Amino acid sequence: MMSLLAASVKTKNLPQQVLRWQSMVESECSAQGVPELVPYVLGIIMVESGGNSETTPDIMQSSESQGWAMNTIKNPKDSIYYGVKHLKGAFDDAKKNGITDLSAIVQSYNFGRAYLRWLASNNKQHSLPVADLYSKTVVAPSLGNTTGAMVKYSNPIAVAYNGGYRYKNGGNFFYSEIVKQYVDFDGGTGGGVPQPEGIGFAKSKYPEGFG
């Protein structure tokens, strides 16, 4: 599965506050046998916390991936350990389900790995409308939102897509698109517009029963 990770995958637009974690990320990815995941982990750190461990010690928001309450993890090292473990598991699940789309795998970091199984069993390919559907019909109802209720979400990608909304208790179906601002996993050449600091960090909000 890791062969689908092109060696040319690069990060972009990352501030020093995120890059300061690069050596720790490289060490942990190497320890878990997945050095290819370093760019993705750094991009996820940017989206989840901006690398600001002073305000968000769980810089990868990894607590939920273990079935714990948000921010249970109190230090960046543990956050990276569990975050890499979760992402590695997503790549393993993708392989089992015949999925090679990196966007789908990155989206599953937010939705939970059940998203990959859902894509496979429903013969669907990840896209923003498909992620929208999963958020509305699977994630949100599992957390009590059975009416499709939406909440305002000011991220520029969301504003461009639907005026700036996502589903209450539905995770963040824009997640993969947001990470793409910081990781060229679609073969881009970089130069994207950085997400403004503080606008819509995409916190994962699913229970691990979902992952």
Model-derived regions, located:
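Non-catalytic cell-wall polysaccharide-engagement segments
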Residues: 1-4, 12-18, 32, 68-85, ...
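Short, surface-exposed glycine/acidic/tryptophan-bearing loops
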Residues: 52-71, 126-128
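Glycine-rich, acidic and aromatic/proline-enriched surface loops and short helix-turn segments
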Residues: 46-52, 111-114
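N-terminal carbohydrate-binding/catalytic regions of secreted carbohydrate-active enzymes
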Residues: 22-44
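Residue-level detector of well-ordered alpha-helical segments, enriched
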Residues: 36-41, 55-58, 101, 105, ...
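An acidic intrinsically disordered interaction segment
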Residues: 10-13, 43-50
